[in-house]
A protein has these predicted regions:
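Amidase signature
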Residues: 1-192, 352-439
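Alpha-helical scaffold segments in soluble metabolic enzymes
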Residues: 154, 183, 232, 236-239, ...
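Short, well-ordered beta-strand elements within core beta-sheets of diverse protein domains
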Residues: 136-143, 222-225, 334-341
């Protein structure tokens, strides 16, 4: 911490203490701070008396002596607390539940039903499958037309070829990937097929921990950071048999698409950024460098880059996926979710990562009833009425029209009038507080 920053911290703490005495307004706090010359440890009864006179107050000698002891003792305590470092992965003692009091939910659980499958065949050139969705890639692996090792090598080759332009990979986990792919092939060969993600190569946003590899949070301040744990989402995808190819780029401290000295690029328009902060997952998935990826979202960090790069991103409801091992930005808004090349891919990945782990107490045990064959007729979809008008992006308008043609019932919605920048400003303060050690 710089000397000026430390001085400002002490000044704020000092003003807080004065406020607790009912002296937080008016001239008194500022006058007393000036009397102390920025060194609250040296405050004396005479300083308080002078400041009180300037502020038009009378404080008795007995009260002044009590204030001297209280101010100095409290400021020393604030300094001691400041030196205690709480690890970023330590959750607060209170946790947020977005459910409205009295609201009830159905606990009916039905089997996960994948959509109708097409008969996929291995192409002559394996790289032709680079952009295939997981629903098709999984059929190639399950039928043993393609091995996980073949698929993994193909994606690794594409990463080496295209990442120098896209800047979407922070750390390549090649050795781990080949080990996991070989294990998947051995299991599948003896009939131990775990499901649609078995043997599928994927990438994870670099705010999510994987033991043995850097977790940089996209910041020079944490460039060599390693965390001795696997995030719950990583552990669950490994249980599903997925193959981790890379730690993918995040904007610095999960903000934007710039990290270190690079900017992650949109594969379809490489002179532009891919959006943030799940910049790497969106870029890599859209460019066919991974089968799918995992991102995080606090204020649009899954949805924004997914739209920019033209892919499917799912920002789950808060409390559906554990954030254990994930860099916190805002404890009541952070969410972890899939970025894929189809909606059903998102459903498949979400099914694998959702649910309680007894490590993130905000996660609820709620069913996820997916039927990939269900008709969309009579499905109610809300749309923000104010977001569509004469200047609306043509693709957004086309999306609404496509939904109507599928039989979806569109219901116009309006956000509360107080929503917007005021709420965002509060969130930005919360985000800054999460990284006060950098101040």
């Amino acid at each position: 911490m710089t000397q000026s920053a430390s001085l400002e911290l002490r000044r704020r703490s000092f003003l807080v203490w004065c406020g607790g005495l009912g002296l937080g307004s008016g001239l008194f706090p500022g006058a007393l701070w000036a009397q102390s010359n920025g060194s609250p440890e040296s405050i004396t009864s005479a300083m308080i008396d002078s400041a009180a006179r300037l502020a038009g107050l009378h404080i008795s000698a007995v009260d002044r002596e009590e204030m001297v002891a209280g101010i100095n003792a409290n400021l020393a305590g604030y300094e001691a607390l400041r030196k205690i470092r709480i690890d970023q992965n330590v959750p607060p003692p209170l946790y947020f539940n977005p459910a409205v009091p009295g609201q009830t939910f159905s606990n009916e659980r039905t089997p996960f039903v994948r959509g109708a499958r097409s008969n996929v065949r291995r192409p002559q050139n394996l790289e032709d499958v680079a952009f295939w969705p997981v629903t098709d890639l999984s059929q190639l692996i399950e039928s043993r037309q393609v091995s996980s090792q073949e698929l993994t090598r193909m994606y690794l080759d594409r990463i080496r070829r295209y990442d120098p332009v896209l800047h979407c990979v922070v750390t390549l986990t090649e050795e781990l990937a080949m080990e996991q792919a070989a294990q998947a092939d051995r299991e599948i060969a003896v009939g131990n097929y775990r499901g649609a993600l078995h043997g599928i190569p994927w990438g994870v946003k670099d705010v999510i921990a994987k033991r043995g590899y850097r977790t940089t949070w996209g910041s020079e301040a944490y460039r060599e950071q390693t965390l001795d744990l696997d995030a719950t989402v990583v552990a669950r995808l490994e249980e599903a048999g997925a193959v981790l190819l890379a730690k993918l780029a995040t904007g610095e401290i999960a903000r934007g698409d710039r990290w270190f000295d690079k900017q992650t690029r949109n594969p379809w328009k490489t002179d532009e950024g891919s959006g943030g902060s799940s910049a790497g997952p969106a870029s890599a998935t859209a460019a066919g460098l991974v089968g799918f990826s995992i991102g995080t979202d606090t204020t649009g960090s899954i949805l924004g880059p997914s739209k920019t790069c033209g892919i499917s991103g799912l920002r789950p409801t808060f409390g559906r996926v554990s954030r254990h091992g994930v860099m916190p930005v805002c404890w009541s808004l952070d969410k972890v979710g899939p970025i894929c090349r189809s909606v059903e891919d998102c459903a498949i990945v979400f099914e694998a990562i959702r649910g309680p782990d007894n490590l993130d107490l905000a996660v609820v045990d709620m069913p996820f009833n997916w039927d990939g064959n269900r008709s969309l007729e009579n499905l109610r979809v809300g749309c923000l009425q104010d977001a569509f008008g004469d200047d609306t992006d043509a693709n957004d308008t086309a999306t609404l029209e496509s939904l109507r043609n599928l039989g979806v019932e569109l219901r116009p919605l309006r956000l509360p009038e107080h929503a917007g920048m005021d709420a965002l400003q509060m969130l930005l303060v919360d985000e800054a507080a999460a990284f006060d050690e950098l101040i």
